[in-house]
Amino acid sequence: MSAPPWSCPLPVEEGLTEEGLLKIRRGTVLRRPGRLTPLRAVAHLAAWLPFILGPARLIQHGWRPVGDEAAIALRSWSELTAHGPMVGQATRLAHGVFDPGPLEYWLLAIPVHLDTVHGVLWGAVICCLVACSLAVEAAWSVLGAAGGLCASGLIVGLMVWMPDIAITPSWNPWFGMAFFIAALAAAWAVVSGHRGWWPVLVITASIADQAHLMFTVPSAALAILALIVGLVDTIRGRPGYWWVVTGLIAGAACWSAPVIEQFTSRDGNLGLLLHSSGGAGTGRQTGGAFSLKALSAAVGPVPIWWKSQQSSAIYQLISHRPAGLAVAVLILVAVAAVMAVRPLRCRPLGALALVSLVISLGALVTYSSIPVHNTSLLTLGYLIVLLFPVGVLSWLVVGTWAVLTARLIVSRAAARSAAAQRRGLPADDGEGPAGQALRGAGPLAGLGAAALIAVGAILAVALQGPTVHRVTADPAMAASVAASRQIARALPGQPIALSIHDFDASALGRMTLGVAWALTPDGFRAEIMRARLARELGTRYVFRGGAIPRVKVRVRPHGTSIAVTRPTQLASHR
C-alpha cells in the first residue's frame, strides 16, 4: 500500500475512484519520499529526549523511590511472585477502590528485579519511549512526515507544559499519559483507514486505562470508535478480519487479571468502579458545569496549557471559564467532521475530528465525576493533564477545517472565473507555477517544523531543572534509605510490623512506603501499622497483630534511629 499524502485533495468529480469509509480519494501532493527519513529520526528523537535526560538527572542527584513510586515498585516486584496484584494503584477518584488493572506492574516487573533501586524509573522510561515511537509511527502512517512531526510536537509540547511527566514517568498518571497519546495516534490511524493499528490501539488504550482511572472513558471510547469504523471499512469491500482477531486476543490478555479478580473476589474491583461511577460511595462530585468549564479552559482563546502549570490555583482558574465556550467548540468540531466527508472529502481531517470529539466527551465525563468529599481538588491537580491533548486537537481540527474550507471556496471561485474568461481553452494540468511552488514549499515546511520541534525538546529539558531539584530534595528519600539500612543490619529478612514516628506529617506516608519497598528485596515483608496506608499496597501489608518483630523508626533532626521489639519481648509484657 502506497504511503498516504501530506495533504487532503480537493473534492473529486463523480465517477472517479474513491476509497474508504468516507469515500475520499487519497491526495497526490507531497508524498513521503525517502529523503525525508531524517525528519522521521528527528520526530522520534525529539519525543525521546525529555524522557531520557530527565530521569538521568534524577538518578544523578540520588533519587530513590518513595511514596507512589515505591508502591509501584513493590507491586511490580510482587508480579513475579505468587501474590501478584490483579488491580492497579489505589485511586482518589473513588473511595476504597483501585485503578482498573496491573499492566504497568507487568511491564515493570523485570526492571525492578534487575535493579531494585532505579529499575522502576528506567523501566518506565523504556516503556514511554516505546509509546512515543508508536505515536509518531501511527501518525506517520496517516499523513507521512506531517503526521509524524505533529505527533512529536504534541508530545514535546506536553513536556514543556508539564515537565514532571518526563522526569518521573513511573508515576501511574504520567505512565498512563504516555500511552494515552499513543492510543490517540493509533485511533487516528485506524479511523483514517489503517486498520492494522487497531491491535496497537487496544494495547496502548488498555495500558492507559489501567494506569489511571481518568483515562478509562476516553480510552474505551477510542477503541470502540476505531473498531466500528474498521468493521464498516471491511464490510465495504476490504476483506480480512485478522486485525479484529489480533486486537481481541490482545485485549483479552490485557484484561485477564482484572476480569479474574472480579469473578474470584467477594467485592470485585471492576464492579466497585462501575458502582462508584454513578456517585455511589463518593459523595458530592464536581458535576457537569465544572466539566464544561474545564473543557473551556482547554480550548479557549488563551488555554490553560498556554502558560506554565500553576497547580495551586488551577481549579480557581477553571471555575471562572465560561461553560458555553466548550459547547461552541464541540459544535465546531462536529461540523468539521461532517464537512470533512462532504464537501472537503478529507478523511484525515474527518478522522481527527472524530477522535477529538470522542476524547472531549470522555473528558467531560471524567471531570464531572471528581469527588469533592474528604479530599481537596488541589490534591488532584494532576488531572488537568488530560486538557492538553483535548485542547490541542480541538485547535488543530478547527484550524485545519478553516484552512481547507477557505481553500475550497477560493479554488471554486477561481475555477468559475477561469471558465468564464477562457471558455473553450485546454484545461490547466495543475502543474503551473503555483503547483510547483507548493511542491517546493513542502520540504522546507518539514525542515522548519523539525527545527521547531527540536528547539521545543531542548526547552523541555531546560525546564526540568526546578522539578528535578524539588523531587530529589524530598526528605523522605534520605530518611527511608537510612532507616532501611539500619533495619537490614538489625534483623534478617522476615515479616515485620513497621511504623514511622517523629517525621514530617506531609511526608510520613511517602517515607513509610519507601522503607517498605527498600526492605522487600532483602527478604522483608513490612506489615504497615497505619491500616489506611497499608491497604493501598494490598491486604498482605496490613498489620493484623501477629507474632512478628515490631520496628519503630524515629526520624529526628540529628538522625534516624530504630527500635525493634521481638515477639518474645511482646509476650513478656503481657
Predicted regions located by residue number:
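Transmembrane-helix signature of polytopic, membrane-embedded enzymes
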Residues: 135-160
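Transmembrane-helix motifs of polytopic, lipid-linked glycan transferases
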Residues: 122-144, 182, 339-340
